[in-house]
Amino acid sequence: MENYGLFIDVGNTSVKIGIGVIDRLLISYTLSTNNSLSGDTLGIQLLQCINHAEQVINKDITISSCMMSSVVPTMDTLLQYACERFLLCKPHIINQDFIIPLDNHYEEQCEVGADRLVAAYAARRLFPDSKSVVSVDYGTATTFDCVTDNTYLGGLICPGIKSSLQALYTNTAKLPSIILNTASKVPIIGKNTKTSLTHGFLFGFATMTEGIYSKLINVLDGPVTFVATGGFARDMANVVCCFDAVCPDLILDGLHLLWIDCLSKSYSL
């Protein structure tokens, strides 16, 4: 029977669910982060994801183990209950049950979010020929996480695109809703509010990214690989010139790689 792993990335805005086998991730899903849901409701949602995946690959799926990264502690207990009751497996939670195999140089190691460490680990594993790697995650916050050799050096935490836009909506009247994507490689001088907002946000964050990149390459040992991830990764990669790779589900990739490591070392999962 083939080994199937379940991978759960719990962020402040969304929960990403991945299902994979040894050699690859098969499929992923995105749910809204909602800690008011019951564990039973979350369990049913997990089963719905698995049932859909079975239809896609035309095979029965029995989850043998689960790896979870979470930055929302209130979701941990709910998802643990959901996995144990509905999937008959206990999720292994990063930084609780399993430690990322990077030399962590953060002053207070417990302060680093599991998502940042998993993304950094994935970037390190996926691009082994680079002396240094930087994962740039466009999530609720925009984070830059730096690894040289096998050492997690730390990083930068900047405002997030969506949360910044929501703050603007909250404090400003009459702003229209916008979709943050564009086919243009250069900013357009907006002649309406939607265009002004779209290009202001996209190219504003693009310039921030490129500015930080230009500083980091002077302090990191090279060569340096810059990797974009998160919900806005593809949109930002269209207007940012410094990315070497775009991996929208880098945290799921990292959980999958950690799962493979555990299986290869015969850890109990």
From Swiss-Prot:
Belongs to the type III pantothenate kinase family. Homodimer. It comes from Lawsonia intracellularis (strain PHE/MN1-00). Pfam families: Pan_kinase. Its EC number is 2.7.1.33. Its cofactor is NH4(+); K(+). This is Type III pantothenate kinase. ATP binds at D9, V10, G11, N12, T13, S14, V15, K16, T140. HAMAP family: Pantothen_kinase_3. Pathway: Cofactor biosynthesis; coenzyme A biosynthesis; CoA from (R)-pantothenate: step 1/5. Gene3D superfamilies: 3.30.420.40. GO terms for biological process: coenzyme A biosynthetic process. It comes from the Bacteria. K(+) binds at D137. Catalyzes the phosphorylation of pantothenate (Pan), the first step in CoA biosynthesis. GO terms for molecular function: ATP binding; metal ion binding; pantothenate kinase activity. PANTHER family: TYPE III PANTOTHENATE KINASE (PTHR34265:SF1). It catalyses: (R)-pantothenate + ATP = (R)-4'-phosphopantothenate + ADP + H(+). Keywords: ATP-binding, Coenzyme A biosynthesis, Cytoplasm, Kinase, Metal-binding, Nucleotide-binding, Potassium, Transferase. Substrate binds at Y106, G113, A114, D115, R116, T193.
